[in-house]
Amino acid sequence: FISKMIDFEIFRPILESKLQIAERKSNAGRRPIDPVLMFKVMFVQRLYGLSDEQAEYQIKDRTSFRDFIGICTVDDVPDARTIWKYREELTRCGAYDELFKQFYAHLQSLGLIVNEGKIIDASFVVSPRQRNTRDENQTIKKGEGDSLWNDNPHKKCHKDIDARWTKKGGDTFYGYKNHAKVCRKTKLIMGYDTTSASVHDSKRGAELVDDNDAVGEIFWLDAGYVGTEEGFVSKSVTPVICEKGFRGRPLNEEQ
């Protein structure tokens, strides 16, 4: 269904421009992996919440994934490290925002964008735990992590200096938090904002309102966004907070 709805070739100009892919002057050597093919790998990975290793395994295991991506044989499936390197390169060259805008414009052209309300909620993205010294962790907490490991670039490229620890419901998380704006009717993602996991929901939310949202449109918000109402009202949309019950104070029928 997705491959019929979206022609992924529309992303090729952005991918080739950002990744600075030059035209091959000869057929010598191994051909580089097609950027649109790798972008489809990223799409499948994000859609199903797969790690790099899981993405490699699942694409090898599922014919439907290979058909969607355009991979003929299992031997042609990119390995986990190739997937990681491609994602890092997309991040480094700042391609994601342009790709998302292109995706949004394409959905609009298909008539899939309807301003009948949006939902904003946050979810954790877990990162591999870092093995740093106490002094290194203190430097990272001060926001000075970029000054570390400059004498060892290979080690530095494997270090995550932006992920943070947080607790929720008695569970501990290390990584990031995705704040997503979703169309209430189609459930398509209309916008996103990524922060470290330690940033509370109440510190984000209104930043996701943009010119594509209708005046007065209702925004349904998770209870974590209590206190952000003024920011939404200032942008001419209507916030509705999902109320939460507490011990001894359960929600009534009206709530």
Regions found by a protein language model. Give the residues of each.
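Generic structural "secondary-structure junction" signal
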Residues: 35, 49, 67-73, 114, ...
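Polybasic low-complexity intrinsically disordered regions
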Residues: 53, 57-60, 78-235, 242-244
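Short, charged, surface-exposed secondary-structure boundary motifs
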Residues: 203, 247-255
